[in-house]
Amino acid sequence: VRSQRMKTELITNVSHDLKTPLTAITTYIELLEDDNLATEVRKEYLGVLKRKSERLKFLIEDLFEVSKASSGNVTLNLVEVDICNLMRQVYLEYEDRVEEADLIFRFRMPEEKVTLQLDSQKTYRIFENLYVNIIKYAMPHTRVYVNANKTKKGIVIELKNMSANELNIQPEELTERFVRGDSARNTEGSGLGLAIARSFAELQGGKLSVEIDWDLFKVVIVFQA
């Protein structure tokens, strides 16, 4: 029953997410057909068209990524990756957005370098998706904790934040396709971020799980050495 419900929700949500930018694009194209439009208004409409087109492009790319990952039809380029350094690099790319979201990140990493055989691009995407998810859904003016602990077999990474939304959802559902933490779907995004992150972790022999304790949201990633 749960599986059928999630399939129905998936179809409904993907239809909604594809239709919304397409409808906007069609509407603004029709508006641009007016020869009497002022230059400034025309520029404004073209700007909206560009943003909606990019939104549609990103959604389709995410669909393609998660489809490939689910089928296992992905080529991995395994190299030595300094996992903690990569996590910091991704954070620096999004530091401005973190400040805009009024969040404070706290990192606790091993003092020694932890290198693993990973696909650096796909591992970057894992943490990019996780940070973006936190920026979108974390409660403003709170701390985000990113902890990495080296083990005999590899590394365990935890990302913890307080959610701005009530999390009335099963943790495992959040890593399914098109499931979001905000049931009202008020934030932009494909709803595929956590699903892609989990798929890319699993493709590299790792694990990604979600834990929820009231409004505390935690993602745990395990990579083997």
Language-model-detected regions and their locations in the chain:
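Glycine-rich ATP-binding loops of the HATPase_c
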Residues: G205-W214
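Short conserved segment of the HATPase_c
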Residues: E166-V179
